[in-house]
Amino acid sequence: MLRRALLCLAVAALVRADAPEEEDHVLVLRKSNFAEALAAHKYLLVEFYAPWCGHCKALAPEYAKAAGKLKAEGSEIRLAKVDATEESDLAQQYGVRGYPTIKFFRNGDTASPKEYTAGREADDIVNWLKKRTGPAATTLPDGAAAESLVESSEVAVIGFFKDVESDSAKQFLQAAEAIDDIPFGITSNSDVFSKYQLDKDGVVLFKKFDEGRNNFEGEVTKENLLDFIKHNQLPLVIEFTEQTAPKIFGGEIKTHILLFLPKSVSDYDGKLSNFKTAAESFKGKILFIFIDSDHTDNQRILEFFGLKKEECPAVRLITLEEEMTKYKPESEELTAERITEFCHRFLEGKIKPHLMSQELPEDWDKQPVKVLVGKNFEDVAFDEKKNVFVEFYAPWCGHCKQLAPIWDKLGETYKDHENIVIAKMDSTANEVEAVKVHSFPTLKFFPASADRTVIDYNGERTLDGFKKFLESGGQDGAGDDDDLEDLEEAEEPDMEEDDDQKAVKDEL
């Protein structure tokens, strides 16, 4: 009997030893307890992270806050995390290629976990999970329930319908199903109508900023409601942070105007107020974003726009379509009137894209590898009598650093050639209309001709590979730019130094 009891205790101890630990209400998972956690929890959100990842560090307190909130509510949803650098088998199994990667598991299903796509604040996480595990809109039986919903999040939407089976109510529910990161409620209770000053059916968006609420006007259709929410769910001016980035770059509005403003500047409040005043005229058309130009985490954003801290305050506009295009105001005045005028002229198509360029170094052509900037690119690359091979690089790029000595040797090889030029251009500081650079390094060949031909190089990055390409007139090693981009994306996650810059590239 004693032996059996001891055996049971030993088995129980082993089970407990392998059970997930908790850190700030977040389950700590490993390969040894991952399956057990999936079996124990109907809904499980898992973050695959790396200890060195800045984005993961920024997410950690919000992730823990969300976990604590759900646990306190007695929810069936649990949050967990996996150190992907230690648990490489799990990371590979679930296709982790960047950090953080967050996946949602339902009923232990490991075949098709859902990718988490919402923001990185606690409310965003909780709202997304509740929408994934519950009804599209919560039924609100009384004023207390409605007030609780409104107070629970930065933004909430309530549909007021005297008949919740009406066509309008059904359109409302369809809109609710389409949005993951905002809580929706629906009510037919007359007291709730009175509480929020409604005497007929309607939809109201409640928010803890700007005007506080927006009443929907017009025909209640899914499309109209989604458009209404898109126009009103973000503040007139939203600060760019680690937490707000997914809302900014994942939203429907792809034209962004950015105010680079140090919070330490003496007239900070006045300049921000001017920016906000201008924003009132462009809701739903242009997203107004404020960036603290003094903050260390934002320096690479400044670099992307060719700005230095001492040049701020400054305004820039960017379109986030397939080809990102930047625009610069003609005036440096940051009054509401000037910013409004700039936005109107942009929307009317009267503003030309802004292309960055460094100053041309005096010795740009004194070395075997010629230095190109925006100002001399056209003259050199499209010289009808020269075959020009150009490396478009970024100073921070690990692949570019590896290529540098080989590229220098290539320059030495052809320094005395009468019609072959080896060149390089820093694409983080220089832009040209003729070439769009999507990854680093990008290698392009400009053969001697009058038709402005551009050939992408996608061969081996070796001296012999480059020489064969040049001696073949740009044939041996030629390939599509898309192929090169795929190669870079496959390689980059292994380069830790590129993590932050890759995030900037992905977001911008």
Curated annotation (Swiss-Prot):
Its membrane topology: Peripheral membrane protein
Site (Lowers pKa of C-terminal Cys of second active site): R461
Residue numbers spanned by region Disordered: 471-508
One Gene Ontology cellular component annotation held by this UniProt entry: protein-containing complex
Active site: C53 (nucleophile), C56 (nucleophile), C397 (nucleophile), C400 (nucleophile)
Record-marked site positions (Lowers pKa of C-terminal Cys of first active site): R120
Positions of the record's site feature: Contributes to redox potential value: G54, H55, G398, H399
N-terminal signal peptide: 1-17
Gene3D superfamilies in the record: Glutaredoxin
InterPro entries: PDI_thioredoxin-like_dom (IPR005788), Prot_disulphide_isomerase (IPR005792), Thioredoxin-like_sf (IPR036249), Thioredoxin_CS (IPR017937), Thioredoxin_domain (IPR013766)
Listed Acidic residues bias regions: 478-500
Keywords recorded for this protein, A-Z: Acetylation, Cell membrane, Chaperone, Craniosynostosis, Disease variant, Disulfide bond, Endoplasmic reticulum, Isomerase, Membrane, Osteogenesis imperfecta, Phosphoprotein, Redox-active center, Repeat, Signal
Family: Belongs to the protein disulfide isomerase family.
Known disease link: Cole-Carpenter syndrome 1: A form of Cole-Carpenter syndrome, a disorder characterized by features of osteogenesis imperfecta such as bone deformities and severe bone fragility with frequent fractures, in association with craniosynostosis, ocular proptosis, hydrocephalus, growth failure and distinctive facial features. Craniofacial findings include marked frontal bossing, midface hypoplasia, and micrognathia. Despite the craniosynostosis and hydrocephalus, intellectual development is normal. CLCRP1 inheritance is autosomal dominant.
Role: This multifunctional protein catalyzes the formation, breakage and rearrangement of disulfide bonds. At the cell surface, seems to act as a reductase that cleaves disulfide bonds of proteins attached to the cell. May therefore cause structural modifications of exofacial proteins. Inside the cell, seems to form/rearrange disulfide bonds of nascent proteins. At high concentrations and following phosphorylation by FAM20C, functions as a chaperone that inhibits aggregation of misfolded proteins. At low concentrations, facilitates aggregation (anti-chaperone activity).
Protein name: Protein disulfide-isomerase
Lineage: Eukaryota, Metazoa, Chordata, Craniata, Vertebrata
